[in-house]
Amino acid sequence: MAVVNGAFEQVLRDLCGDWLAHNDCALIASGMVGSRQGWKEAPYLDCPAGISAAASQLTTVPVTLANGARRVLHIAPGLRYQEAHGAFDVMRGEETQIWGARLAPGSRCVLPGTHSKWAWTGSNGEVLQFQTWMTGELFGLHAKHGILGRLMQQDHSRMDDFRAGVKLGLVSTGQANHVVFAARTAGLMGQVAPEGLPDYLSGILIGLEVAGASAQDDAVTRSQPVTLIGEDNLCERYGVALELAGLAWQRSPPDATTHGQWLIAKAAGLLA
């Protein structure tokens, strides 16, 4: 949801005002509402971090309802992880989904999207580390604003072309800037029809992501299913890619976000 001109309080009133006027319940939010461009910035927690740490670091925002009643919105913090080479990675909102996904101890999960997240959790459900893969954004940039999109035609999903792209991506780690050009040459050489090129490019990028992100896993971790958290169509695509990589997968419950928010609110003592 896009909020225009910083009118966060008005949007909250429009969406929840009638309900809040008759319910004295806790208000909790997570995700980009707590970003630097959001309602109020909620500081990042350093990994490893779990529900109890998030519950102790909620950022509060005073809210005035249409009837004049005053409430408090609690915003969950995001997470940051510093890799061995010094670069930081961050997430906002995905941590809430991870905690709400009812993962087994010591799991790994993937949250597909514009900025796909791979995360590894500990024995108590805490997020140990994670990686961001800009797969969705790169697809959009290549398909809409680059030369790779010149031959593309939008059509219904072509999974055979997607699978072909995944297979190429899986065996091309370390050659990302080279192999994505195949989404043009495959069209020029007649290997893939214009209608199939978007799926072919998508497959290449997701294949590169799966190969790169899973490379660090040991044999024990690779033997466990990857939990996919997110929108159905994207998760199905990632499921296909994981299977082609020889990895088992499963879906999280659909209420991961709201369940995660409930767990944070409960740990913070906001629930009766």
Question: Where in this protein do the model-derived segments appear?
Answer:
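Glycine-rich phosphate-binding loop plus the immediately following alpha-helix
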Residues: 4, 78-169
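Short glycine-aspartate micro-motif
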Residues: 26-28, 107-111, 227-228
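Adenine-nucleotide phosphate-binding core of ATP-dependent small-molecule kinases
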Residues: 169-210
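Glycine-rich phosphate-binding/hydrolytic loop that grips phosphoryl groups
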Residues: 250-272
